[in-house]
Amino acid sequence: MKKVLASATILSLMLVGCSNGGNDESSHKDDSSKTEQKDKSSSQHDSKKDSKRNDTNNKQDNQENKSNKEQTSNQNSNAGEQRTSERPTTNSNGISSDNQNKQQQSVQDNQNKYVAPYQSENATRVARYLSPFEGDRSQALQQLPNFETALSIAKNEANMYGSENKSYNDYSIEQTEDGFRYVFSFKDPSKSNTYSIVTLNRQGQPTVVDPNFQP
């Protein structure tokens, strides 16, 4: 009888031990599963963070590339504008800035070359008749443009009316409210005894007073 009880007790203890072992194994499996899920979730989270970081970096790279392209485009545009601005401009009369610069240089060259005022050979007293000058000629000439330059400007102005081949005849000086001015006469070869009268002030501005003067 005692042996039977002892056997029953041992069997009962074995069953309890097996039950506890099963519970421990099940608990261990649950813990392992939770750990794997946690690791998997963490890995997915890290992957999402990396993906998001890559997207951000790509956006920044795209913005930098776009900014570089815009900067390059602006530089090219500015360079084109600069090249355009360096080209000779043309005014409404079709005269380029280069030609104007050459004309100004020619005027300056003539001013640097002093030529004493003179009458033409066998000149008729026309300008001297219209404007006889009795003042200080040296003082007046100091206030007026170079004679050769003034004569060239006045002749070009005279040739704009009637014949374009007028010849220089004579000159005089006339006193005005603001100083002095030249008075030139140019003979018109297409008309008998006809002269063009042109004045030129201190600023070098010509004025045709009479394109068909007959003394």
Swiss-Prot record:
Residues 96-110 have a biased composition (Low complexity). It is found in: Cell membrane. It is a lipid-anchor. A lipid is attached at C18 (S-diacylglycerol cysteine). Residues 70-95 have a biased composition (Polar residues). GO terms for cellular component: plasma membrane. Keywords: Cell membrane, Lipoprotein, Membrane, Palmitate, Signal. A lipid is attached at C18 (N-palmitoyl cysteine). Residues 17-110 are annotated as: Disordered. Its main location: membrane. This is Uncharacterized lipoprotein SE_1947.
